[in-house]
């Protein structure tokens, strides 16, 4: 493991990185929120279907 090389790589990445604008951050937050809501909705649908299937017990 070459520590000086790794540190220079990290510094180079940090110099290239920039903070997103408010519009970009807002768009990313909306997309991430929609993804989380979609996964939750999918889980709820599976739970609801398994509740009505005979012989299955919801946890």
From Swiss-Prot:
Coiled-coil segments: none
Annotated keywords: Cell membrane, Membrane, Protein transport, Translocation, Transmembrane, Transmembrane helix, Transport
Spans through the membrane: 33-53
Keyword Protein transport attached: yes
GO molecular function, one term: protein transmembrane transporter activity
GO cellular component: plasma membrane
Protein name, per record: Protein translocase subunit SecE
Protein family according to the UniProt entry: Belongs to the SecE/SEC61-gamma family.
Location(s) in or outside the cell: Cell membrane
GO biological processes: intracellular protein transmembrane transport; protein secretion; protein targeting
Membrane topology: Single-pass membrane protein
Function description: Essential subunit of the Sec protein translocation channel SecYEG. Clamps together the 2 halves of SecY. May contact the channel plug during translocation.
Keyword Transmembrane helix: yes
Subunit structure: Component of the Sec protein translocase complex. Heterotrimer consisting of SecY (alpha), SecG (beta) and SecE (gamma) subunits. The heterotrimers can form oligomers, although 1 heterotrimer is thought to be able to translocate proteins. Interacts with the ribosome. May interact with SecDF, and other proteins may be involved.
